[in-house]
Structure formats: C-alpha cells, structure tokens
C-alpha cells in the first residue's frame, strides 16, 4: 500500500491527494459491482407491495414469512445483500491503508487541509475530557446519513435498523482513527452518493425509453 501511495503521491504531489486518487481508483474498479448492487436495491423497492402482502398474510408466523420472503427474492432474482457486497470488497483496502498510516514514518507529520498529521486524528480546537473535534469523521458520518436518505428502504426491518445504526457505529468506532483514513472514508461516501444519483438517473432514463417503445 505504501508503494502505491508513493506512486500516487509522485503524480499528485501530495499524500492527501494521493489518498483521494486512491479512493477514486477503488471506486472505478468496483463500479460494475456497485451499479449492480444499486439495481438490486431498486428491484427490492419495487417488491415492497408484495412484501407487505406477505407480511400481512404471515403476521403470526415469522418463520414462514421469512421463508416466503426468500422465495420471492429467489424468483425475482434479487439479493437482499447486493448493496453490501461492494462495501465488503473495500475492507482489504481500508485495512491496508490503516496499517500503512499507523506504521509508515513517511506519513507522519504530513499535513493536508486542516489536518496537521495524516497518521493522527484531525483535531480542531481544544479537547473536553479528552474528546476533541474531528471534522473529517463528522463529515463522513453526515454523508452516510445522507446516503441512507437517498437509498431505497430495505424490505427487512431488522436490516433497516442495522443500516440506521451504521453511521453511529462508524462515528464511535472511527472517531480517533488517523485523518488519512477519515479522508478516504469521506471521499468514498461522496463518490457513493454521486454513483447512486447516477444509477437512479440511468434507471429513470431506461424506464422512460422502455415506456416510449411500448405500443399505444
């Protein structure tokens, strides 16, 4: 990972810009899977009426409802976890970047924007009881909330609750992480929102074209 960051730094002239470029490259590589996952989420949204019918029909039998729901997914060729797969594929990059920021002396005391050290949290202002203000993590959390607002609702209530808790979990878990890692996650969330908006635009355009080709 350090070799790749050094290569990107030679291109951009900055480790901060190198991390941003790395995020863009990862997103471009994963774009086919992300686009497929977004399509799966839209298909899930179209299944909502059928899922509501099943939920009402089997409201007293949760086990049978779960079985019928999975059968519906299978018939419609929809994966309830399709949107999560690209995020899981990014974990190795995330872990490798964290390890590099934590252990590489080249990245210590390297500043970018307001962050004085990419290998340390981007602390701004005084601390209170040992807790300071880390803008990049707060921005990333806000972007995650926005992304959830723009995403189609999940059919499974338990999955929906987990996704609603994810920004809070990420905020607590990553609050003291290196600012270089927070920068990666922040840019990643921005690109995810842009990709989602593009997928929604492409889907509407495709649906409009399909409607125009239907015989009157």
What is the predicted role of each segment?
Residues 1-216:
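Helix-loop-helix
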């Amino acid at each position: 990972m350090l070799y790749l960051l050094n290569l990107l730094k030679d291109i951009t002239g900055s480790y901060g810009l190198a991390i941003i470029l790395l995020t863009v490259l990862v997103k471009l590589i994963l774009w086919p899977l992300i686009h497929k996952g977004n399509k799966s989420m839209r298909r899930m949204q179209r299944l909502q009426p059928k899922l509501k019918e099943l939920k009402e029909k089997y409201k007293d039998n949760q086990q049978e409802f779960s079985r019928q729901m999975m059968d519906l997914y299978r018939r419609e060729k929809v994966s309830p976890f399709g949107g999560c797969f690209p995020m899981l594929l990014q974990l190795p990059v995330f872990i490798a970047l964290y390890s590099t920021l934590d252990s590489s002396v080249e990245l210590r005391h390297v500043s970018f924007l307001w962050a004085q050290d990419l290998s340390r949290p981007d602390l701004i202002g005084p601390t209170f009881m040992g807790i300071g203000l880390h803008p990049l993590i707060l921005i990333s959390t806000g972007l995650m909330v926005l992304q959830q607002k723009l995403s189609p609702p999940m059919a499974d209530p338990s999955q929906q609750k987990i996704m609603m808790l994810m920004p809070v979990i990420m905020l607590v878990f990553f609050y003291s992480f290196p600012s270089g890692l927070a920068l990666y996650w922040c840019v990643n969330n921005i690109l995810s929102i842009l990709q989602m908006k593009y997928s929604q635009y492409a889907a509407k355009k495709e649906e409009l074209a399909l409607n125009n080709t239907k015989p009157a």
